[in-house]
Design a protein with these regions (language model features):
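Active-site-proximal catalytic alpha-helix in oxidoreductases
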Residues: 193-221, 225-238
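NAD(P)+-binding Rossmann beta1-loop-alpha1 motif at the extreme N-terminus of oxidoreductases
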Residues: 6-72
Length: 316
């Protein structure tokens, strides 16, 4: 992955002492963004994105524009169809609907002892751990990324990456060195369940409202009738999460949705317009399964009513 234009990081630095590659698996905006930031930090990055996307990434590349910078940075990706050599890090950044297909590129014997960061919004990742090994870490991206063809946009403030410590967490933490000079704010969490729901609750509510009304979340917050639904839906989601013994603080989750950047669109909104249903299935399955475990009648919830309307839109 070689930048064709000036990158966002100008500080002079030595290349990483560990020259093993970082593999980033996926074909979405998060894949491109993480690959670009890790390249800016001097790492050898290889993207696994499937036949068509591999060709596009390696020949046409992508451009990255961040609200926090006036620069437009261009990148071409080194690509592969599978993990060929022992990496120092593997990142699974694929959308929920593409995770299973992307796992065909990984194998325990190739990954070795390298940590695997899994950014998927899927709640249950046990089957992924069985495929990649016990050094799997849940990770969550708190930022607003959008992709339009070969253009990737980061809206709003500098994003944050939350990495959840796994049961094999060792005192020697490899991530500070890997993410140094990327410009990302990296935090480490011990409560994976809480971290998941603090990510998923605003993601689900923002996705459902914007998709149903075919409006960006920013526009929804300017409409009082629609805006007033946000606290109620967050509260419903928090009640479902309580089935796992978790008490979510709803106020910061509501504020997060109120502060969405003007141009940001949740993936579900675009997917419905294209006739897809992967995101709807993801959100529905997480909420329904968690509600069942919490012994909550999900069928009577406002969340379920919105989901039904969204499926009707998809089927039209």
């Amino acid at each position: 992955l070689e930048p064709e234009a000036e990158t966002a990081e100008d500080e002079v630095r030595n290349p990483p002492s560990d020259t093993r590659p970082v593999y980033v698996i996926g074909d979405n905006a998060l894949t491109c963004y993480l690959a670009a930031k890790l390249t800016d930090a001097g790492h050898d990055v290889i993207v696994i994105a499937g036949k068509e996307n591999n060709l596009s990434f390696s020949t046409n590349g992508i451009s990255l524009k961040e609200d926090s910078s006036l620069k437009l940075s261009r990148y071409k990706f080194n690509t592969s169809f599978w993990i060929k050599e022992e990496p120092k890090l593997v990142i699974i950044a694929a959308d929920a609907g593409h995770v299973n297909a992307s796992l065909a590129a990984v194998a325990k014997d190739k990954i070795g002892a390298a940590p695997v960061l899994c950014f998927t919004p899927l709640k249950d990742v046990n089957y992924i751990e069985a495929m990649v090994g016990g050094n799997l870490f849940r990770a969550f991206f708190d930022g607003y990324l959008q992709q339009n063809g070969q253009q990737v946009f980061l809206y709003g403030r500098t994003p944050q990456v939350k990495i959840c410590k796994n049961v094999n967490w060792e005192k020697e933490n490899p991530f500070p060195d890997i993410f140094a000079y990327t410009g990302l704010n990296v935090e480490y969490e011990t409560d994976t369940v809480r971290c998941y729901w603090e990510f998923f609750a605003p993601y689900a509510v923002g996705s459902l409202l914007s998709a149903l009304n075919n409006k960006n979340l920013f526009d929804i917050t300017k409409d009082k009738q629609l805006r007033d639904q946000i606290p109620r839906l967050i509260a419903e989601t928090a009640a479902i999460a309580a089935g796992e013994g978790l008490e979510l603080d709803c106020e910061p989750l509501v504020k997060k949705l109120y502060a969405a950047p003007m141009n940001y669109r949740f993936p579900l909104q675009d997917e419905i317009n294209a006739g897809g249903y992967g995101e709807a299935n993801l959100i529905s399955s997480v909420l329904m399964n968690a509600a069942h475990s919490a012994k909550i009648r999900f069928m009577d919830s406002s969340l379920n009513k919105i989901l039904k309307q969204i499926y009707n839109l998809i089927l039209v």
